[in-house]
Each structure stands twice: as C-alpha cells, then as structure tokens.
Amino acid sequence: MTTATEKQTAKGRKILLTIVGIPIVIILLSTALYFMVDTKIVDLGTVNNGTLITPPLRFSELPLLGLDGQVQDYGKPEPKWSYVVFGGAECIDDCERMLYLTRQTHIALAKKMPRVQRLYVSTEGSVSDYLQGQMKQHYADSLVATVDNTALQKMFSTSGIDPLQKNSFFVVDHNGWLMMVYQADDLQQHSLNSLGKLVLKDMRRLLK
C-alpha cells in the first residue's frame, strides 16, 4: 500500500514538474528568439543571402589597434554596422577585391550609407607602405586597424569559420556582434556584381 502511494506521489511530482517546467522552457526560448530578432540576427519570414554565424561573435571585444598603436574602440565615435575584411600587411588579389566589393555595396546603400562603415583589419601588426597608399587613394573612407592573430583565431574557434578564408568579408552589427559572412565563388566581375546585389538586399532589410 505504502509502495503504491509512494509511486503515485512520485508520479504526481513528475507531472507537477512538467507542468511548471514547460512554461519556463517556453519563456526561455521566446526570450532567446526575441533577442535574436531584436538584434536582427534572425529575421523571421526572410532568408539571408549571407551565411549567419550562430552564435554571433563578440567583435567589439577584440583588442583592435589603430596604425598609431592606440586602442581603437569599435563603438566610437558612434555605433555603426560594419563591413570587415581581414588580411595581412599586404592586401592584394582576392583581398583587394573584397575591399572593392565592400566599397561598392557601401556606396550603393545611398541614404543608408552613413549607418555603415568599412574596416580593414590586419593580423600582422601593421600594413605595408604600399597598402597604406592604396587605402588613401582608393579606400580613403575605410578604417584600418590591426589585431593579434591569436586573439582573432580564439574568437572564431567555436564558429568553424576561418576569418582569413579567401574571397570573403564579414558583417558586424551596430551592437558589435559579428553575425554574417559573405564569400564570393570567384573573382570574376559578374560574380562580384551578383554577390553585391545579394549583400545589398540583406543590408537594406537589416537597416530598416
């Protein structure tokens, strides 16, 4: 009799825990979904043309340095969305084409252009004189910074993505979350044009 009562009591407790637990789980999932939609990591009812990085990476915590060696605060003077290209002291071939692509898609944002900035990040502690000249001549409104490669690789370690993979650039939201990557199939102009249109489609939606 006692055993049957104990079993019934245990069963009742499990049912009670289930009843109490389900709303908690729903609340937690709803909160997570709300955060992802609110920060535009997820846009319900739409499909991103870039590859979402989940969970997003805290780019704003990377120890970025300006070319003068001073700490560069990602969020200053004001928070903006960013196109980020990672490379070395030199940026040629596929790397330079990503600078070109991000510049063109940035310009094409028109009225929304001021809400986005472009950033080139060298993992080699500096950039060459040649690259500095190229940046001034062709990409004067792009920011340039350096970062320790070990710190960069550590940030990406859980994502399964190589930050230095060819033909690619990243999108960081205005809150400092690195949340999307685009990669061109090749460097042919028609391929870059096609990718640029997809980037614009995503960015115009994200910047609403």
How does the language model describe each region?
Residues 25-28, 38-75:
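N-terminal "domain-start" segment that seeds a small globular fold
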Residues 1-11:
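N-terminal Lys/Arg-rich, disordered targeting/topogenic segments
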Residues 14-35:
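Hydrophobic membrane-insertion alpha-helices, especially the h-region
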Residues 166-208:
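Thiol-/selenol-based redox modules, centered on thioredoxin-like
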Residues 97-138:
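Structural microenvironment flanking redox-active thiols in thiol-disulfide oxidoreductases
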